[in-house]
């Protein structure tokens, strides 16, 4: 497959979410593991440039996580995620995060499910609101679904979670019903 351009950009769902929050003026912290590599150095500089708290970032002996995104001529993307050190994030890491009532705890699935679930459990116990972007999509434990206040999904993710195909011909009412069924399964 021949391509016609390449860009190297800092990101990942978690970092993109943190940058968006920080740009909106929210006090933002990021939990993650950064490798001792060129990507890690660039990521750390980018994170600091956006005034994101780095207290919960740890160095990893594994490489920094990366994603390779391809976009076809129709604008459809395909993403390969290699989590690197972020795959080592665990419940103990999330226990260290300071969360207060009224905070918004945001996560995605580029870290282990057990860590996301522990983070949301702590957030709910502290009175925070939880927001989950379940990508890359996979089966979610019922506990995580029940701990999630706000679920941000695209068409593919919604189809997967409600276990039924959704197409351009699916009515808004059917989509709403499918979304409601996620919590009640």
Where are these regions (language model features)?
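Glycine-rich phosphate/adenosyl-contacting loop at the front of the ribokinase-like
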Residues: 1-33, 38-52
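Beta-strand->loop->alpha-helix junctions that form or flank phosphate-binding loops
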Residues: 4-7, 31-36, 54-64, 133-135, ...
